[in-house]
Amino acid sequence: KNLLVAVYHEGGRVQRFKDEFTNIPKMNLIGQIYQKDKKHANKIAKLIGWIIAEELAAVDIDFSFTPVLDIDYGASSVIGDRAFHQDIDPISELASSLIEGLNFGGMQSVGKHFPGHGFIKTDTHTEVAIDDRPLETIQNNDMLTFNNLIKIGIKGIMPSHIIYSSCDQNPSG
């Protein structure tokens, strides 16, 4: 096969295929389970990854842009319930489990929205968003989930469409 086919199919409100596909929950539900039972939440994340991989492969989709690695700061309705959690360690752990499930199903993963979209309220599909936080703040918070997943071997990263004014006056993606 010479052509890679990708889709936004992460679960919750960003699930492009619905008919005859498993209804994948929004990722913050797994984060809520994590608060009560980490082991169970990780099993669920892995199973969801496997389901996504198996169902998409059955219709010749090579990969999905998932998981969302953003921190849920409670500010962004665009990210919000798409994020696993508001803390870095649970995000990294649950995303790792989801990726393990994707890989078990023969699918690679693409983490998003580098270097972090959870702090921004603006919908970057309709408006220009600017994150004026110092680079050090972004590096010591938002980027840590990406760094953690890069260390374990995530195969792709999708940038956000945000201007990080402490770095550049152009959008990152």
Residue map of PLM features:
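Second-shell residues forming the walls of enzyme active-site clefts
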Residues: 1, 90-173
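N-terminal beta-rich core of secreted/periplasmic extracellular enzymes
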Residues: 1-76, 84-108
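Short acidic, glycine/serine/threonine-rich loops at helix termini
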Residues: 16-20, 75-78, 121-125, 168-170
